[in-house]
From Swiss-Prot:
CC terms in the record's Gene Ontology section: cytoplasm; DNA-directed RNA polymerase complex
Keyword tags: DNA-directed RNA polymerase, Nucleotidyltransferase, Transcription, Transferase
Protein name, as recorded: DNA-directed RNA polymerase subunit alpha
Keyword hit for Ubl conjugation: no
Organism taxonomic ancestry: Bacteria, Pseudomonadati, Pseudomonadota, Gammaproteobacteria, Alteromonadales
Catalytic activity: RNA(n) + a ribonucleoside 5'-triphosphate = RNA(n+1) + diphosphate
A GO term, aspect molecular function: DNA binding
Region entry Alpha N-terminal domain (alpha-NTD), spans: 1-234
Biological role stated in the UniProt entry: DNA-dependent RNA polymerase catalyzes the transcription of DNA into RNA using the four ribonucleoside triphosphates as substrates.
Chain spans, region Alpha C-terminal domain (alpha-CTD): 248-329
EC number: 2.7.7.6
SUPFAM superfamilies, A to Z: C-terminal domain of RNA polymerase alpha subunit, Insert subdomain of RNA polymerase alpha subunit, RBP11-like subunits of RNA polymerase
Length: 329
């Protein structure tokens, strides 16, 4: 094996085994001895505690004043209903919170798919059972879903919201992490004559709101960004000149024509007065689909072109448009 003894081996992704749509095994090798546990434990902790996601935070059920009561015609008690709501997998697009409505009557199970919502909300597990109705009972509830990170118990919010919270609004312990299970294993690896290397195998499962492969990618990005501070350590006694960063990425200031979309897609955007890429990325999928003559095929094209440039729909740009563009318009 060539190279200096002081140089570290650079690992590579050997295999990504998608066991199911929500579970994957990722193999990374070769790693220097000990680095398997170092990286595996760091990624595991980030995936469990620091990944952003959505969770139910508040619930209102007609006829229910507190969580220790029961609802006539509902097989489960209120506490069990709240526990089932914790298993609701929701994806929000272009917003950080949403209030969902559920109205169901008649005997039978009440499913997550029975929840009414707008186009910016996606119920990922519509077959998830929330409760069971008996007889001709009717159930009506309002469910608040928020984006967050980590685990936030209801008790931490109850003290601060006690005075303003209406009677009957039930607070729920919120686990925002989209990762439901993760483990890692370190095995031996070999490169030429070296047999003391590590192979890291990460086995993880999500609630379906994020692809397992994408979750690992994001956790690695979070870890790298945190470590950047150590890479950029400087002598504090030396003044550091601050570089003036442009307010917006230059690509956002370019006209939409630079994306080289098909004539149909380009004309649809011009008809909506979407002149710059910065204008486009702030639109959501739902908003674009309301554009006359712009169908799902054109929407897919726009998303793919933006993705190739590291952009996406539904982005938020503070202080847009900049003065340079506003003056032109």
């Amino acid at each position: 094996m060539s190279g200096s003894v002081t140089e570290f081996l650079k690992p590579r992704l050997v295999e990504i085994d998608n066991v199911s749509p929500t579970r994957a095994k990722v193999t990374l090798e070769p790693l220097e001895r000990g680095f398997g546990h170092t990286l595996g434990n760091a990624l595991r902790r980030i995936l469990l505690s620091s990944m952003p996601g959505c969770a139910v935070t508040e619930v209102e059920i007609d006829g229910v004043l507190h969580e220790y009561s029961t609802k006539e015609g509902v097989q489960e008690d209120v506490i069990e209903i709240l526990l089932n709501l914790k298993g609701l997998a929701v994806r929000l697009e272009g917003k950080t919170e949403a209030t969902l409505t559920l109205v169901k009557s008649g005997a039978g199970p009440v499913l997550a798919g029975d929840i009414q919502h707008d186009g910016d909300v996606e119920i990922v597990n519509p077959s998830h059972v929330l409760c069971t109705l008996t007889g001709e009972a009717e159930l009506s509830m309002r469910i608040k879903v928020e984006m967050g990170r980590g685990y936030v118990p209801a008790s931490t919010r109850r003290s601060s919201e006690e005075d303003d919270r209406p009677i009957g609004r039930l607070l729920v312990d919120a686990s925002f992490s989209p990762v439901s299970r993760i483990s890692y294993n370190v095995e031996s690896a070999r490169v030429e004559q070296r047999t003391d290397l590590d192979k890291l195998i990460i086995d993880m499962e999500t609630n379906g709101t994020i692809d397992p492969e994408e979750a690992i990618r994001r956790s690695a990005t979070i870890l790298a960004e945190q470590l950047d501070a150590f890479v950029e350590l400087r002598d504090m006694s030396e003044p550091v000149e601050k570089e003036e960063k442009p307010e917006f990425d230059p690509i956002l200031l370019r006209p939409v024509d630079d994306l080289e979309l098909t004539v149909r897609s380009a004309n649809c955007l011009k008809a909506e007065a979407i002149q710059y890429i910065g204008d486009l990325v702030q639109r959501t999928e739902v908003e674009l689909l309301k554009t006359p003559n712009l169908g799902k095929k054109s929407l897919t094209e726009i998303k793919d072109v933006l993705a190739s440039r590291g952009l996406s729909l539904g982005m938020r740009l503070e202080n847009w448009p900049p003065e340079s563009i506003a003056e032109k318009d």
